[in-house]
Swiss-Prot record:
InterPro entries: Chaperonin_GroES (IPR020818), Chaperonin_GroES_sf (IPR037124), Chaprnonin_Cpn10_CS (IPR018369), GroES-like_sf (IPR011032)
NCBIfam families: PRK00364.1-6, PRK00364.2-2, PRK00364.2-4, PRK00364.2-5
Protein's cellular compartments: Cytoplasm
Record function comment: Together with the chaperonin GroEL, plays an essential role in assisting protein folding. The GroEL-GroES system forms a nano-cage that allows encapsulation of the non-native substrate proteins and provides a physical environment optimized to promote and accelerate protein folding. GroES binds to the apical surface of the GroEL ring, thereby capping the opening of the GroEL channel.
Name under which the protein is recorded: Co-chaperonin GroES
Disulfide pairings: none
Gene3D superfamilies, sorted: GroES chaperonin
Pfam hit, one: Cpn10
Length: 103
């Protein structure tokens, strides 16, 4: 089996899937207490870095995605598949799991 080298540019989401770079979680509380990794909340905000071609309709056409590369999005807490590339964390999720575009 050949080794596969993954990078953001080599990940191409299929269908209505979206590849999102996860925003950094808070390192400490408002009171200044440092949080260990096990106590940090899983972030639910990130930036879209790749978008699939859209959901396939019954007639074979595609429904264009509502989000695009560069959009900052809020997504469901337990949605998608977590992927780590280097020191960065990403999540691959269905467009339906995106709750809002954040300005």
């Amino acid at each position: 089996m050949a080794a596969v080298s993954l990078s953001v540019s080599t990940v191409k989401p299929l269908g209505d899937r979206v590849f999102v770079k996860v925003s950094e979680s808070e390192e400490k509380t408002a009171g200044g207490i440092l949080l260990p990794d096990t106590a940090k909340e899983k972030p639910q905000v990130g930036e879209v870095v790749q978008v699939g071609p859209g959901k396939a309709n019954e007639d074979g056409s595609r429904q264009a995605p509502e989000v695009g590369v560069g959009d900052k999005v809020l997504y469901s807490k337990y949605a998608g598949t977590d992927i780590k590339l280097g020191s960065d964390e990403y999540v691959l999720l269905s467009e339906k799991d995106i709750l809002a575009v954040v300005n």
